[in-house]
Amino acid sequence: MPSLELTTNVAIPDERAFVLEFSKFAAKVLSKPEQYISISVKHNPNLTFAGTFEPALLLAIVSLDNIDPEKNVNYSKELFGFFKEKLGVPDNRGYINFNDPGRSYLGYQSTTFTEIFGK
């Protein structure tokens, strides 16, 4: 069920194509089926990082059962590599926030994931 919300000050020429490519990449990196991946991209030209408007980003990831300190290191490496290649944002110009709220705190299909998959 990963949802990824990207905010960047980089203008993306074809946002829809980027979102679809990002969705496939995120599914691979997070080892989750793409059918459960949700991507949101927001362009904010006023986003600053380290006091400048140079290319920057903020990424919030909410995902169940696969967020942990060891995996987050690899996720960070892979995702920042993707953003460097696709958006020109270096790895020192953004933050990635990893969050696993727990199955009871995420709703889907009129219930929660605890009810769907158990504890």
Q: At which residue positions do the language-model features occur?
A:
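Interaction-mediating elements
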Residues: 1-119
